[in-house]
From Swiss-Prot:
The lineage of its organism: Eukaryota, Sar, Alveolata, Ciliophora, Intramacronucleata. GO terms for cellular component: ribonucleoprotein complex; ribosome. It comes from Tetrahymena thermophila (strain SB210). GO terms for molecular function: structural constituent of ribosome. It comes from the Eukaryota. This is Large ribosomal subunit protein eL34.
């Protein structure tokens, strides 16, 4: 008859956190080896992007406290939050909106100078 294995921890139910794999030891015994949960990779937080972030460690949330800061972030604006394409598009969008504001200011100030020139030419 096959050898039976028992749980090593207190929880005796087949839950998601209590998954077990059968492993044969060098001594020939079958023992229960606990399997860690599958880790979800860190994704870009921009709406509709959901790209995996490169350079960020894929660990369980509790393990983030123990790993180095260099494994948790990327040395860039929004590093560890947004992917590089989303950061690039945000920078370009911000630049273009600033350009539009400058152009609007120039367009508003131009007619005033034209009126002054016309008045000085009439005199």
């Amino acid at each position: 008859m096959a050898q039976r294995i028992t749980y090593r921890r207190r929880c005796s139910y087949n839950t998601r956190s209590n998954k077990v794999r059968k492993v044969k030891t060098p001594g020939g015994r079958l023992v229960a080896q606990y399997v860690k949960k599958v880790v979800n990779y860190t994704k870009c937080s921009e709406a509709g992007c959901n790209v995996a972030l490169n350079g960020i460690a894929q660990v369980r949330p509790a393990e983030y406290a123990t790993i180095a800061r260099s494994a948790k972030t990327v040395s860039r604006v929004y590093g560890g939050e947004l992917c590089h394409t989303c950061v690039r598009s945000r920078i370009i969008r911000a630049f273009l909106t600033e350009e539009v504001k400058i152009v609007k200011r120039k367009m508003i100030s131009k007619p005033k100078t034209d009126k002054k020139k016309k008045r000085s030419q009439k005199k």
